[in-house]
Design a protein with these regions (language model features):
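Terminal-region recognition feature
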Residues: 1-332
């Protein structure tokens, strides 16, 4: 299995980040006999990239349109590395991909959190390594507080409001609660309930329609699994890592990345090449197919669509340093 440092060793002139990444994407497609799309973002590397650049957004639909163009197969391997983002943007992506592909296998080389996990639920199966993880899908809200913007779980807002109702029956408790309650805008509680319901519905519908298709009581099984993934009270933190064993125990259809050594080598080579691209170029999000068509979002928000030119390769460091793998929060 190639390491990050071994792939870094290939990043020497005349090679470019694009040529190395695309070499392994092409080899991967040849090995699996399916179309391959990479969706990877710079979310596990320390940076000052704005969250909306690395999150799943409506703009990503354009990226997928770019890379789906010209693909002939009806089967897709989607390599996914994402902190999550907008559930409704994720829904748009799923609807688009499912118009084209009858079978989608989602390969997670490291992490797919939140709405990224929701996207995996739209696959027929999920490929995870020993080190791979998914996460809870409970929705989050960004609230403006006296301490600045904070990302707060929707369920925590609802629970806190119920706590306030109970404690404020004693009017002596109104004083401490007023600054907290004043931060809640009009309609927030309804929005929280709707967001939770939407996450459950989207994940449940996709699981029933695709992953559990043909199984007995598929809808019931999918509904229970979706509710579990969206249960903030169960996981306590939106950033919890659900391992391969955790996901299999929940009932997700999981394939082991290590079952096919060539597949593992190629997937991780693509993944390492993408993370090194993020380290050595301004790229912060890459949507790319095995034919070299790409939609690249730079850290400054600039987009580079269609057969993106090779990004310049700076002088490679003499001593490889493993990039940090700390996760970042997402909207859902």
């Amino acid at each position: 299995m190639p390491t990050w440092g071994e792939i870094l060793g290939e990043f020497q002139p005349p090679n470019t980040p694009d040529s190395i990444r695309r070499k392994y994407l092409s080899q991967l497609a040849s090995h699996v006999g399916r179309d391959v799309i990479l969706y990877s973002t710079k979310w596990t590397d320390p940076s000052n990239v704005p969250p909306d650049v690395i999150s799943i957004t409506e703009e990503d639909v354009q990226g997928f349109m770019e890379v789906v163009h010209g693909l002939k197969n009806d089967k897709l391997d989607l390599i996914l590395h994402s902190p999550g983002g907008s559930p409704v943007a994720t829904e748009a992506i799923v609807k688009y991909l499912r118009k084209k592909f009858t079978h989608i296998r989602v390969v997670v080389p490291q992490g797919a959190m939140s709405a990224g996990t929701m996207l995996t639920c739209a696959g027929n199966s999920i490929v995870l390594g020993k080190h791979s993880f998914l996460g809870p899908i409970d929705p989050q809200f960004i609230l403006q507080t006296q301490l600045g913007n904070r990302m707060v779980p929707a369920q925590a807002i609802l629970d806190e409001f119920e706590m306030a109702k109970s404690e404020c029956k004693d009017t002596h408790n109104l004083g401490p609660w007023l600054p907290i309650l004043s931060q809640y805008g009009p309609g927030l509680l309804i929005e929280c309930k709707n967001a939770i319901a939407l996450s459950r519905k989207l994940a449940g519908d996709w699981l029933a329609q695709y992953m559990f298709s043909g199984q007995k009581r598929a809808t019931h099984k999918a509904s229970i699994l979706a509710r579990t993934l969206a249960d903030h009270k169960k996981y306590k933190s939106h950033g919890r890592h659900l391992s391969r064993d955790d996901c299999r125990q929940l009932g997700l259809v999981i394939e082991d990345l290590e079952q096919d050594q060539i597949l593992q080598d190629l997937v991780l080579s693509v993944f390492h090449a993408s993370t090194i691209t993020f380290n050595q170029t301004p790229a912060a999000k890459i949507i790319e197919n095995h034919n070299g068509r790409a939609f690249v979002k730079l850290s400054g928000g600039i987009r580079l669509p269609v057969q993106v030119q090779n990004l310049p390769l700076p002088q490679a460091p003499k001593i490889p340093v493993q990039p940090s793998q700390a996760p970042a929060p997402a909207l859902s």
